[in-house]
């Protein structure tokens, strides 16, 4: 079916800071199910800098995937609201179906958990990569035509400028979509991601590759469209440890080479520690802690982050049982009052069961939503097993723990609290 030129994207009232590519504020996503309304995401704020790798970590069911799928319109049947959803000064909260068609795979690419379900089993990998290149070029060309037409109609440009820029866009489109150009780019990408004998393997089908190689092909398709942002939704879950490391290293190389921004989703906190620049910790549809990777993994302050750190298998005595977080994520049909983690938190205070904590500042970039950071809260010692895991992480990150205690945090809220322990 021929692609149809879209209207221009809606521009948000708020313009992004120069260093940001994405700014989301107060995001809520819910689903109507048989038993009621499932509140998957509850008031999430995300800021993503250009060229960064941002990690979102949490247990399965925390709302990580639902949160990022709202960025690409993949939450079918969901009710999505936000005060702001700004991607490259495009208001994605007002996107229509035909606009999503241009946006996905052109500006944003998505890498899913299982490559087997991302690839068409009836098409060769060469054809699939080439199709991604061709379609993205065509979409960008038609979008440019639409934008130029709008600029002409609104007198942002004159007729001569319109004709000149349109001719340039057409020339670029033709040059990039010749058979030779698309073939050459496909080979270049496959060679870079480590597909041996790329020319020969162009005619191979997905079933002829291992799981690790299939995931590399999915990554190739994702970068072939030259997106500004790649969302990697637990892309290494189905891979063994050795292949995981290779896949992550490949994604990082592509980020450095192409200056692509990456949002990386995982329930594996050790992967996040070794891969990301900035980290959001998510639980029961809310963010509970956020900060630079070295801040989160050398000075975590939220009990949920402590629990995730303690569950890292690295450094655990081979004869000792693995640590797990007791209890379960609450039923999001009726989220609990107060802090959703309180029932599983051995350090919970009485107020945790009554009021949702605001974010407290640990540093300018490190914040956490826990009443333990309130000036009147009792002092709580970080668990010994968490300290052990921090020591391991510190070595991996090649940085040192702060030698001085953290300054007394400042609250973003004015609520007074009772600090009596509930335990």
UniProtKB/Swiss-Prot annotation:
Membrane-protein topology: Peripheral membrane protein
Every ABC transporter domain range: 24-309
Disordered as annotated region, ranges: 398-423
UniProt KW Hydrolase keyword: no
Gene3D superfamilies, alphabetized: P-loop containing nucleotide triphosphate hydrolases
Binding positions (ATP): 58-65
One example GO MF annotation: ATP binding
NCBIfam families in the cross-refs: oligo_HPY (TIGR01727)
Protein name: Oligopeptide transport ATP-binding protein OppD
Organism: Mycoplasma pneumoniae (strain ATCC 29342 / M129 / Subtype 1)
Gene label: oppD
């Amino acid at each position: 079916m021929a692609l149809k030129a879209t209207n221009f994207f809606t521009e948000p009232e708020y313009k992004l800071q120069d260093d940001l590519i994405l700014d989301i504020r107060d995001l809520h996503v819910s689903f109507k199910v048989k038993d009621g309304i499932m509140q998957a995401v509850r008031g999430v704020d995300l800021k993503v800098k250009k060229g960064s790798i941002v990690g979102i970590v949490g247990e399965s069911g925390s709302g990580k995937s639902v949160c990022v799928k709202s960025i690409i319109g993949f939450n079918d049947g969901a009710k999505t609201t936000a005060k702001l959803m700004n991607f490259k000064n495009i208001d994605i909260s007002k996107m229509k179906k035909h606009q999503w068609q241009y946006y996905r795979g052109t500006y944003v690419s998505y890498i899913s958990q299982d490559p087997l379900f991302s690839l068409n089993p009836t098409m060769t990998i060469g054809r699939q990569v080439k199709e991604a290149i061709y379609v993205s070029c065509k979409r960008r060309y038609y979008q440019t035509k639409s934008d130029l037409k709008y600029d002409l109609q609104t007198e942002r440009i004159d007729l001569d400028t319109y004709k000149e820029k349109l001719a340039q866009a057409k020339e670029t489109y033709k040059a990039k979509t010749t058979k030779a150009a698309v073939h050459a780019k496909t080979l270049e990408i496959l060679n870079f991601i480590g597909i041996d004998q790329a020319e020969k393997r162009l005619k191979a089908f997905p079933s002829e590759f291992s799981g690790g190689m299939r995931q590399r092909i999915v990554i190739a398709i994702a970068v072939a469209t030259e997106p500004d942002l790649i969302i990697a939704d637990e892309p290494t879950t189905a891979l063994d440890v050795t292949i995981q490391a290779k896949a992550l290293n490949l994604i990082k190389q592509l980020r450095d080479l192409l200056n692509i921004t990456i949002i990386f989703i995982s329930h594996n906190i050790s992967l996040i520690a070794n891969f990301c620049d900035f980290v959001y910790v998510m639980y029961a549809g809310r963010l509970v802690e956020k900060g630079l990777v070295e801040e989160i993994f050398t000075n975590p302050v939220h009990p949920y982050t402590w629990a995730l750190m303690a569950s890292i298998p690295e450094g655990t005595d081979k004869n000792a049982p693995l640590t797990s977080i007791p209890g379960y994520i609450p039923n999001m049909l009726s989220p609990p009052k107060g802090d959703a983690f309180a029932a599983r938190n051995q350090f919970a205070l009485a107020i945790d069961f009554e009021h949702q904590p605001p974010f407290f500042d640990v540093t300018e970039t490190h914040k956490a939503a826990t009443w333990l950071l309130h000036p009147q809260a009792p002092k709580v010692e970080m668990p010994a097993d968490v300290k052990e895991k921090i020591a391991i992480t510190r070595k991996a990150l090649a940085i040192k723990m702060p030698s001085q205690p953290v300054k007394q945090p400042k609250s973003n809220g004015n609520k007074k609290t009772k600090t009596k322990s509930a335990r």
